[in-house]
Regions:
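Conserved catalytic core of the tyrosine transesterase superfamily
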Residues: 1-274
């Protein structure tokens, strides 16, 4: 009962993305299993119980980010219990978060981005598609998940913008660059020649089987182009998004505008640009 309520709380009240909810569920199950093994009701756990769990669990977790997420999940569960009056005091309140070492993402120069684009074989059926993908990741700062879920019905080419469904199902409007729009127009013609599966009829980017592109496919496209261009940096679709924000900032854009374009809710997330 409480578990179902908690999952609903994560989705509807916290507005977390599906990926975040899956991670929080896994963390909760880990906590619940530990408490059951020690004959402790997870709802009635004390600070000492939680501290023992953290101490024991962290032995097998080397990543500070994973440790931080686990503690965040614990805090989230007990805040939920407190808010819904299952408990009178939050036993996780004094649990400390580990300091997460910040690693700045790689930034691509304009020359490097141009070099990647130059590697796209425009004679192939996927040429215009891949060019449009790079232009939208960099020119609009999309997350890879936002790109794979992009719908034709949310692209307003005449008006020059897209409606993006971001993390936590939050919507925002982002501009489409003239180059991205041009390449996307070419891709639409190629797309119309595919045997498009019914479930993918409104999906913007498809593979040659007429199915939705996956995040792994986008990663592969970006990585192969970077390697072909001789770029030795660690590159991912997020690198293009980060480069978009960095170049805007270097050219005098307001940090708050960049935050809105990226769909970042919390200022702390944009600290890497300050």
């Amino acid at each position: 009962m409480i578990e179902r309520e908690y999952h609903t709380y994560l989705k509807l009240e916290r507005g977390l993305s599906d990926n975040s909810i899956v991670a929080y569920k896994l963390d909760f199950n880990r906590l619940k299993t530990y408490m059951e093994e020690h004959q402790i009701d997870v709802v009635r756990a004390t600070f000492d119980d939680l501290q023992a769990f953290v101490f024991e669990t962290f032995k097998g977790i080397k990543s500070a980010k994973t440790q931080a997420r686990l503690l965040s999940s614990i805090h989230s569960f007990y805040r939920f219990l407190l808010y819904h009056r299952y408990i009178e005091q939050d036993p996780s309140e004094l649990l400390e978060m580990p300091r997460v070492e910040k690693h700045l993402p790689e930034v691509l120069s304009l020359e490097e981005i141009d070099a990647m684009i130059a590697q796209i074989d425009m004679s192939k059926p996927e040429g215009h598609r891949n060019r449009a993908i790079i232009e939208m990741l960099y020119g609009s700062g999309l997350r890879v998940s936002e790109l794979t879920e992009l719908r034709l019905s949310n692209i307003y080419r005449k008006e020059g913008y897209m409606r993006i469904l971001g993390k936590g199902s939050k919507q925002r409007l982002v501009p489409i660059s003239p180059v991205a729009d041009e390449q996307f127009g070419y891709w639409l013609k190629d797309r119309s020649q595919l045997d498009i599966k019914p479930e993918a009829s409104d999906i913007a980017f498809l593979n040659h089987y007429g199915r939705q592109l996956t995040r792994a496919m986008i990663f592969t496209i970006v990585k192969r182009l970077a390697e072909a261009a001789g770029i030795r940096k660690t590159i991912s679709p997020h690198t293009l998004r980060h480069s978009f924000a960095t170049h805007l900032l270097q050219n005098g854009a307001d940090l708050r505008i960049i935050q809105q374009l990226l769909g970042l809710e919390y200022t702390v997330t944009t600290e890497i640009y300050t």
